[in-house]
């Protein structure tokens, strides 16, 4: 596939690197000479210094032969206008725009909704020519809400139906400690699947001989209703979240507060596929008076405090350390980590930290942070989900992007269609986690005798960038604009 990316910042360069690793033809465009030079030194792709919103410049970069365009500049309007411009001349190209401004994002979402209502779900053209619109803050807030739903005991990967993958730390007291997977399978009450293991900084797909050690992070596939039991197996406990303190009055914090307001819950929880909130008590703390005022105007019923969250007087007066959960969601990612670690030392039960990317996960773990929300990884995963073809529904990276968990529809051209899993001799380095054949009403964890039919949906884990595995399941990518 040929993909043109406009914007050679950190996210644009990270996306280009991931796409090049899959063998795609990537063209990265930016009008900043220094960013172009830096990207050109680091990436094995075409990097061009040009005005990305100029159609002539894009055509010189090979726009007419492109499959997709991704706009990641720092200017939301440029990102949106560029997509509209390209759509007018090349409607077949899939266009993805990052829009950071929440108001811009919501207005576009609303226009798209009205177009669908007026013309039906099969409307010929997307609003503003944008096939897929993403807002990093909305994606991050959604991840925070998912973590809150299950007590912030670990991170959770949303996959098929009633299932999820819980990424949990194995405690010293865990029933899984120092046991092989084949022995874990015989434990009373164990009806789950360990999909991957992160041990000593390395992520592996386990086999029956793999030994689970205290301190390991394990990805456990289970029904959502069984999460409290899964937590017990790893030595953790399911803890209700009632009182929440949020550090930072930035966009992600505002969206998190909005999701907890009774008048907004129907919208937010239908948008993100969550259950309704449990009536949590929220307090937001920020040192910036203007941000506090803005948030207070938006949510008059919320408790907004101006101050330093590490100030002993504030901690004592507001009894901050007795909260159930502290969410560090400011725009300063390094301070989020340090604040989370400090609050954990002061006795806060659970902490969530918003970070720049998954490179900080290992450090966060050593600092005692329960859950990290890596902003750039979330954005990359969302974009990659859209660039794998219409049969690929979602992509979640794990283990510093070593592996990916992919949800897809089995194409009639797929090599696995109509075959039993035990007859698939080319699954090395991958694992089928869930399957749902066309006649099935629910997802199931398959076994060797399970046949995967054409039109089925499947969730599998494979090495990142292994396009052969993706095509084996989903067939050759076909983009749909």
List the predicted regions and their residue ranges.
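Cytosolic regulatory regions of ion transport systems
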Residues: 1-481
